[in-house]
């Protein structure tokens, strides 16, 4: 009886597609209202001035201006949009 027992299929061999998270508009870049600044899971970056946060923690611009990242003493990084009038000064 030189039989080979039927081999079971592997439990591995699947992967999920990348979710395209991360910064979409870097510091110093010009944005308009509604532009997505960052996609994230949780609050890696926190919303600052003129930045809104969606239900999935996406950060977006509320006004036209320049993106600015600022680290605070508590270890949190805040993302703000400086309006064009302020950015020019």
From Swiss-Prot:
InterPro entries: Ribosomal_bL27 (IPR001684), Ribosomal_bL27_CS (IPR018261). It holds the Pfam family Ribosomal_L27. Keywords: Ribonucleoprotein, Ribosomal protein. The keyword Ribosomal protein applies. It comes from the Bacteria. GO terms for cellular component: cytosolic large ribosomal subunit. Residues 1-20 are annotated as: Disordered. GO terms for biological process: translation. HAMAP family: Ribosomal_bL27. This is Large ribosomal subunit protein bL27. It comes from Rhodopseudomonas palustris (strain HaA2). The lineage of its organism: Bacteria, Pseudomonadati, Pseudomonadota, Alphaproteobacteria, Hyphomicrobiales. The gene is rpmA.
């Amino acid at each position: 009886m030189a039989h080979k027992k039927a081999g079971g299929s592997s439990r591995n061999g699947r992967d999920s597609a990348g979710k395209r998270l991360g910064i979409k508009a870097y510091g110093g870049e010009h944005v308009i209202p509604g532009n997505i600044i960052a996609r994230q899971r949780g609050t890696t970056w926190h919303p600052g001035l003129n930045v809104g946060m969606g239900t999935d923690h996406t950060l977006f611009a509320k006004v036209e201006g320049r993106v600015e990242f600022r680290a605070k003493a508590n270890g949190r990084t805040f993302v703000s949009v400086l309006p064009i009038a302020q950015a020019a000064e």
